[in-house]
Structure formats: C-alpha cells, structure tokens
Amino acid sequence: MSLTPQIKEKPLESLDADQLRRRVLTLQYKYTTLQNEYEISKLSSERETYSLQNKYDKSMNELENALKDTKILYEENIKLKEELKSKDALPKEDEKIITTLRTQVVSLKNEVNLKEQRIVELAHKLSSKQNEVTNAIESMKLEIEGSGNILHQHETQINKHVEEIRYLQQELKEKENLISELRSVQTSASHRNNSTEELQDLAVLNKTLKEQLNYAKELEDMNLKQATELKKLRQNNDVQSLLKKENELLQSKLDQLNSLQKKFESLEMENISLQEKITQWGIVRLDGKFKNPNDVITELNMLQRENTFLLDTNSKLQIDFNQMSMLNDEMAIERNQLLDLNKDYETSILNLKRLNHELEQQKLLSFEECKLLRQQLEEFEEQDDKKKTPGDQVNASNIIEGYKNQTEDLTNELKRLNEELSKTDDKIQKRRKITNDLGISYSQRLNELILENKKLERLLSATKNHANILEQKILDLTSLKEKKVRILQLRDNPLLKEHYIRKEKLALLEKENSDLLSGIETDAIPRSVYDRIKHDMKLLEKEIFSANKKTTRLKEVFNKKSLEFIEAVNSLLGFKLEFLAHGKVKLVSCYQPNKYIIADLQSNTLKSDLDKVIPEWETLFQLYVIEKGELPAFLSQVKLRLWELSQP
C-alpha cells in the first residue's frame, strides 16, 4: 500500500518495468478489495432480506387464517339469512326452534365479536410488521443505492486503471525487448568485461520478480474470494426484489381484508335487522292451514310453478299475437298484390277488347271482300260461259274452287280467332270472379284481424297521408291546362306490332288475290305469292332470332347467377360446389383446396380423401351421419377441423 502514492506522483514514462508491474498489481489489488467489500455488503443485505422473508411468511399465514375465518363467518351468516327467510312464516309450534336459533345467533354473535377482535389484533400486527418490512426495505434500498453509487465510482476507476494497465503493458513489452537486447549484447560481449555490480543488480532484479509473482498469486486468491461474495450479494438482490413483490401482494391482501371487514360489519347490521324482524313478525300472521314449515315450502313451490306456467302462457300468447300481426301484414301485402293483379287484368281486358274490336272490323272487311269476290266470280263465270270452251271452263272452275277453298279457310281461321277471343274473355271473367271471391274472403279475414291488431292507428295515419298526397296530385292535375297534357304510348307496342303485321299480311294477300285473278288466263305463278312467302319467312326469321337472343340472354343470366350462388356458398359456408353427372355434388373446402368430398344424392353415399388429413374423421362420421343423420352438422365439424389445422 505504500507504493501507491509514489506511482501517482511519478508519470508513466519515467517508470521502470518493475515499477509498472508493481503499479498494475496494486491496481488489481484495489479492484479485488472493492469487489470483496461489495460482496460482503451484499451478503449482509441477503441475510437481512432472509429474516424479513421469514417474518413476511409468518404474517401471510396469519392473514390467510384470518381470511378463512372471515369466509366461514360470512358463509354461516348467509346460511342464517336463508334460514331466517324460510322461517319468516313459522307457526306458533316452532317458537322453541326460534328460541334455540336466537341462542345460536347470540353465541355466533359472540364468536363473531371474538373473531373480529382477533382480526383487529392481526391487522395491527400485520400493519406493524408491514411497517417494519417497509422500513427495512427502504433502508435496504438506500444501502443498495449507496453501494450502486460506490460500484459505479469503482467501475469508472477500474476502467481508468485498465486503460493505464494496457498502456503499462505496452511499455513493459518495449522494456522487455530492450532488456532482451541488452542481455544479448551482454552475452555476446566477453565475460571479462562483466562487472560485479551488474551481476548484483541482476540478482536483485530476480528476487524482486519472484516476490512480485508471489504477491500476484495472493491477489488472485483474494479476487476469487471476493467474486464468490459478489455472487452471494447478487442472489440477495434477487431475493430482495421478490420480497418487494410479495410486499405488494401483502398490501393488496390487506386492502381486501379491509373490504371484508366492511362487508362483515354490513352483514352484522343485516343480521340485527333480521333478528328485529323475527321479533316483530309473528307467527300470528300465518294462516291456520300452515302447520309445518314444509307446508309453507310446498305452497311456495306451488306458487312458483303457477308463476312459471303463467309466464309460459303469457310468452305463448305474445308469440301468437306477434304471429297474428305478421299474418296481418302478410295478408295486407297479399291484398295489395291482388289489387295490383286486378288492375293488370283490367288493363289486359281493355287491350283485348280493343284487339277484338279491330279483329271484328277486319272480319267484316274480309266478309265484304269475300262477297265482292264472289260477285266478281259469278260475273266472270257468266262471261266465261259465253266466251270460253269446255276445257277452259274446267280450268276456271278449278281455279274458282281453289279460291273458294281459300276463302273458306280464311273464314274458318276468322271463326277460330273469334272462338279463341271468346274463350280468353271467358277465362278473364272467371279469373276476375275468382279474384273477387278471394278478395272478399281475404277482406273478411283482414277485418277480423284488424279488430284485434294494435297497428290500426299507424295504418290509418299512413292511409290518411297517402290520401292527402293523392288529393294533392288530383288538384295538381286538374290545375294543368289541356294543351300541356300528353298521352304517351310505346313506339314498339306489341298491339301496334301485331296490327302492323296483320295489315301488311292482308295487303299482300289482297295483292296475291288480284294477281291470281289477273293470272287466270296464264298458267304462271304470280310474283305476289313469292313476296308473301318471303314475308312469312322474314317473320319466322325474326321470331327465331328473338327466341335465340332470349335463350342466350337466359343462359348468360343463369351462368352469372349460378357463379354468384357458388361464390356466395363458398364465402358463407366455406365449401365450393361443383355439380357432377348422375346426381353427384363435389364439395371443395376453402381451407384445403386440394381435398374434396363427393356426395352421391341418388345412392346417399359420401366419398372423400379428408380421412388422411383429419384424424377424427371416422368418429365424426359415425356420430353425426350414421347415429344422428345430420349431414350439415358433420360438414360444419369438418370445416372447423380444417380451419384449426390451417392455423399456424
């Protein structure tokens, strides 16, 4: 220790190799002594924490026992409450039981007071022990903070010394190199030149080096001892942190004990109030039919059953009422739909009447044309009889017969059209009668339901608002000028289309008729026949084109809707559906796209390769499909298992 001031006074450059080594050893010794001091302080703190831990464990055991006692008292108090509730209506014969219960209550009260006193004592003890523990912990904290500051200072000093040691080691290496060079020079020189003084110096140096080595070994032993003490101090620090946590838990348990004490006081007050009620309420209030407490219990059970039954009936009536209201709403919707259908039928009847009127006009025109044609034919026959030969007469008679056949065909077709129109009129009238009858029956049923319905006011208010809106619209329409009113009609109206086609066909037939009349003298077929056939072909092509267009559109819509349906099923149910041939359906899970389930709806069989993925496949199949016959539940279980397997 006497070497340290000399080392501090001299600079590092002026020191020899021996002095540098001595300085390094002294610094190492200081470092080890500091470490040993820290380990010793840590050991002392560990001992203190161990003693505090023992005290803490004892206090915790006492507190747990107190808590158990309070819980037992609380449960006994609850039992007493229940007994008091059940014995509020006891008969006169049970006064002895009440007296015994009162004595038990008094004894329990005394026990509770004793327990309360014990709890108060334990609380005082715990608070005193807690104060001791907190004081000890605070002192330990202060000691730890002081030791931490000292450690920090020592670490800074040690870092400085380590840097100095490194610098000194470098200088030592240089000095050793110089010494080795000098020794080599000395050995190379002659032994005669060696002086006795140099030999003495070398011997002294050898002795000092041996002493320094022994001193270094002693310092290393001291360092090891201090390291063990440091480990013990660190263990004590960990124990101290555990003690802090346990102290926090103890504080929370103390808070719980305070809350339990408050609960206990409230329960005691309730117990006193219940005793007062027992004294005030008498057995006089009970009916004579209650001879035993069991009678009261049975009566209470009966009343509870009646109450539950009445609640069930009330809920059923409420459900029936809700169903009736829903049925009423549905019937109102059906009535509105029937009214809309009635309006549609009336409009269709008006359209059919218009068509009928037009067809009758066309029929009259065709009859008149037939009459004119017959007159012309008769005149023509008279002229031909006068002019032509018997062969020509035969040809003319054949042509006339053909025309007659055509006219008869036209008349038959007109009759058929009239019959169809009459049939459609009869059907419409029948449907109208049926709808009227249905409307009458529905209206009667609605009237009966509306009388029992509470939503009449809402419907009335809605209808009043609707009526006001309609009246306002009527006023707006009447205020408009006649010039501004325009009747709109569809340009491509089907009625007009049919009328146009019939008109065009009639014109072609008239032209064909006139051409045939003019071409009687010749054997050639007139062009108008070709035009009519061409027109019929165009009409057929248009019909075929529209039918093909409709079918393609229906196919597109069907494909689109089927894809939407499959996507919706896949997103909502987790299975992608693929419809196979022969009534088979392939189910592919979204969690395992490579696996599948094929369900044969005709033979009621399942085929899948999921049994290798799901280990519980056989048990699930046996439980849900074979035993319970619930395929949807089986599929949902499979989906859940696949989802669990897909989770990381």
From Swiss-Prot:
The encoding gene: MAD1
UniProt key word Coiled coil: yes
One GO BP: mitotic spindle assembly checkpoint signaling
InterPro entries: Mad1
Annotated source species: Kluyveromyces lactis (strain ATCC 8585 / CBS 2359 / DSM 70799 / NBRC 1267 / NRRL Y-1140 / WM37) (Yeast)
The keyword Coiled coil is annotated on this UniProt entry: yes
Function: Central component of the spindle assembly checkpoint.
Name of the protein in its database record: Spindle assembly checkpoint component MAD1
Superkingdom as given in the UniProt entry: Eukaryota
